[in-house]
Amino acid sequence: MQKDALNNVRITDEQVLMTPEQLKAAFPLSLAQEAQIAQSRGIISDIIAGRDPRLLVVCGPCSIHDPETALEYARRFKALAAEVSDSLYLVMRVYFEKPRTTVGWKGLINDPHMDGSFDVEAGLKIARQLLVELVNMGLPLATEALDPNSPQYLGDLFSWSAIGARTTESQTHREMASGLSMPVGFKNGTDGSLATAINAMRAAAQPHRFVGINQAGQVALLQTQGNPHGHVILRGGKAPNYSPADVAQCEKEMEQAGLRPSLMVDCSHGNSNKDYRRQPAVAESVVAQIKDGNRSIIGLMIESNIHEGNQSSEQPRSEMKYGVSVTDACISWEMTDALLREIHKDLSGQLAVRVA
């Protein structure tokens, strides 16, 4: 690393990472797994476009810090998905990167050992190995696209991606979304602004050119064709924004922007007033709107784990409770199972009219 009076003045270390193609060679996908992911992306695109009447449910831990917990959750999730598949299309949240308002644990890729060692290469290996195992279980997977380089390492494994409230306004993330190979949801801003998400969706649908890395790890000029499979995610802001009036306002603004109204409701964050126990009430309110004839709501997002609540990420690993979130608080598996079964029951026989 060149370091002198002008270059890298505030850089203290440099580590060259393995390339995306090296990581993929170590943890490859089979042709059958590739076909499975392509199929699930197609199903999600059909739901967004109104061709598939089912409700898309992106559900799972706020973040992944323990692969064993993730696998246990996945086994339960997979069994439930099969039982509710005629009305709900369940996609498991597998979030490895966490945006922070100030500082804090940034996720499994950045700091897999949760000790400040920032062993990113180990984090990438752990993440890809886990994702391949989850795909092998037959699950479609969801994540938040945060670091612009991560999709080259892991993007082939995901069926859906989100651009978060803190990054939706970022040009870098809009450009990245335009090149992602899966459908993308754009969250409204942390202040509740819908325009932020709508403008991001419009921008990401267009072709872009930007500097990134290729599969060989080389810096390259990348050209995208634009991503037509976008939608808005209502996550609340200074106040919740999932009421019928809020949904109607989002529909109006999307139509004015020349977009087909297509939106998901995040049952956590601002919509739950940051009280994880309110997520079922939010979900039930949204389902009631669908039963009343709403056709623009295509999905729900739920933060769920094996056990409810959360715990500090700064305590020793040996003292952490199994199956409890180290970031946002989540509802328990028992509550998740009951909620999704109830939604399935409520929507069964009511979805045919939603087909565009």
Curated annotation (Swiss-Prot):
Gene from which the chain derives: aroF
Naturally occurring in which organism (per UniProt): Salmonella typhimurium (strain LT2 / SGSC1412 / ATCC 700720)
Catalytic reaction list: D-erythrose 4-phosphate + phosphoenolpyruvate + H2O = 7-phospho-2-dehydro-3-deoxy-D-arabino-heptonate + phosphate
Further remark: There are 3 DAHP synthases, AroF is feedback-inhibited by Tyr. The other 2 DAHP synthases are Phe- and Trp-sensitive, respectively.
Pathway assigned in UniProt: Metabolic intermediate biosynthesis; chorismate biosynthesis; chorismate from D-erythrose 4-phosphate and phosphoenolpyruvate: step 1/7
Domain of life: Bacteria
Keywords: Amino-acid biosynthesis, Aromatic amino acid biosynthesis, Transferase
GO biological process: amino acid biosynthetic process; aromatic amino acid family biosynthetic process; chorismate biosynthetic process
Purpose: Stereospecific condensation of phosphoenolpyruvate (PEP) and D-erythrose-4-phosphate (E4P) giving rise to 3-deoxy-D-arabino-heptulosonate-7-phosphate (DAHP).
EC number: 2.5.1.54
Name of protein: Phospho-2-dehydro-3-deoxyheptonate aldolase, Tyr-sensitive
